[in-house]
Amino acid sequence: VIGGDECNINEHRFLVALYDPDGFFCGGTL
């Protein structure tokens, strides 16, 4: 994302992020 801003936990409940032991690897929307 270019020009995006970080959000607080629970601020956008329809977004998901998938993590494995190495860190973030995928994201999406519900």
Swiss-Prot record:
Family: Belongs to the peptidase S1 family. Snake venom subfamily.
Major enzyme class: hydrolase
Tissues expressed in: Expressed by the venom gland.
InterPro entries referenced in this protein's UniProt entry, alphabetically: Peptidase_S1_PA (IPR009003), Peptidase_S1_PA_chymotrypsin (IPR043504)
Signal peptide: none
Known function: Thrombin-like snake venom serine protease that cleaves alpha-chain of fibrinogen (FGA) releases only fibrinopeptide A. Shows coagulant, esterase and amidase activities.
Subcellular location as annotated: Secreted
Major location category of this protein: secreted
SUPFAM superfamilies named in the record: Trypsin-like serine proteases (SSF50494)
One cellular component term from this protein's GO annotations in UniProt: extracellular region
Entry GO MF terms: serine-type peptidase activity; toxin activity
Any one GO biological process: proteolysis
Keyword terms: Blood coagulation cascade activating toxin, Fibrinogenolytic toxin, Hemostasis impairing toxin, Hydrolase, Protease, Secreted, Serine protease, Toxin
Cystine crosslinks: none
UniProt-recorded name of the protein: Thrombin-like enzyme LmrSP-2
Enzyme Commission number: 3.4.21.-
